[in-house]
Structures are given as C-alpha cells and as structure tokens.
A protein has these predicted regions:
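Short pre-active-site segment immediately N-terminal to redox-active cysteine/selenocysteine motifs
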Residues: 59-69, 74, 88, 130, ...
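Disulfide-rich extracellular modules and peptides
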Residues: 14, 24, 69-72, 94, ...
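Surface-exposed intrinsically disordered loops and tails
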Residues: 11-39, 74-88, 119-120
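Secretory pathway export signals and precursors
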Residues: 8, 17-18, 63-66, 93
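Short, flexible coil/linker elements and helix-boundary hinge sites characteristic
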Residues: 5-6, 12-20, 46-47, 113, ...
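Electrostatic cytochrome c docking/interface patches
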Residues: 19-63, 100
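Short, well-ordered amphipathic alpha-helices
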Residues: 52-54, 70-71, 108, 112-115
Length: 153
C-alpha cells in the first residue's frame, strides 16, 4: 500500500531489482533535458551568470537537483544567505572546495558518487552519508559545470 514517488531511472543494470534505486541508471533523459533547459533559461534571463551557477541554485523540483538546498543557509525556506556559505552541508566558499579537492576530477567523482558513512574523501573529508550522489541525476557535463562554479566561490 505504500508507493514511492521517486522518478524511475533509465539504463538500470539487470541485477537492480528496483529502477527507482538502481546503481547503474540515471534520471530519464527527458528530466535531465528539463534540468538543462531550465538552467539555460535562468542564464539567458540574467538570473545567473553561468550554467554551473544556475544548476547550483536550481529550484526545479523543490531544489531536488540543486546544491544550494544544503550548502546555502536559508535557501530551502526562501531566505538564502551567502551562496555556498554552508547550511546542512559544509561551507564551500573562500577556496575551501579547492583545498578539499585540489584536483577537479576528484571533486567531480565525489559529487557523482556522494558520501559514504565513514569513507574518507578529498584531503581531509570523513564521509557522513549525507551528501547524495548526483551522478544519477545530473549529466557529467552538468556536474563539471557545477564544480567549475563551486571552485570559484
């Protein structure tokens, strides 16, 4: 009688029993395209300067695909403070993201895979399991754009 509201993923591995939680899949391409289209619209409208900034702050789907939801205090309840300044997630400003991930590729991999409880990441990170894996939600190009933006905060 309970029903999940998660969007089923595409390209799940055969061993994955449930397409809503499969490890090998991703959001439907139509949803990924919707995310990209909205980010491009926000840049064209002048709301944000780059696709990475737009994706970081994207409120599509109540912020389910954005970083600001956790990394900007007040963002989730309509009173955003310093962008990337920390909230539920850590502060990403002042070069802290670059210090944690000196190599861009390591930061991309972390965002794609998320945090695992007790597993080390970056230079000094200790996983809590709170950082979701965005690799199944955003494309590699979108994640790279977000990383470029965050590394400049």
């Amino acid at each position: 009688y309970l029903k999940s509201i998660q969007i089923p993923r595409e390209n799940c591995l055969v061993v994955d029993a449930d397409p809503r939680t499969c490890d090998g899949g991703h959001l439907p391409v139509a949803k990924q395209d919707e995310i990209q289209t909205e980010a491009e619209r926000l840049v064209k409208a002048g709301t944000y300067s780059t696709i990475g900034e737009a994706l970081f702050n994207l409120d599509l789907g109540s912020g389910n695909y954005s970083c600001a939801r956790c990394h900007t205090k007040g963002w989730s309840y309509g009173d955003p403070q310093i962008t990337g300044g920390g909230g539920f997630g850590p502060n990403l400003t002042g070069g802290s993201a670059v210090r944690q991930f000196p190599q861009k590729s390591d930061m991309v991999s972390f965002i794609q895979g998320g945090s695992e409880y007790g597993k080390r990441y970056g230079e000094q990170g200790q996983g809590s399991g709170r950082m979701p894996a965005f690799g199944a939600m955003l494309t590699d190009e979108q994640i790279s754009a977000v990383v470029d933006y965050v590394r400049g905060l």
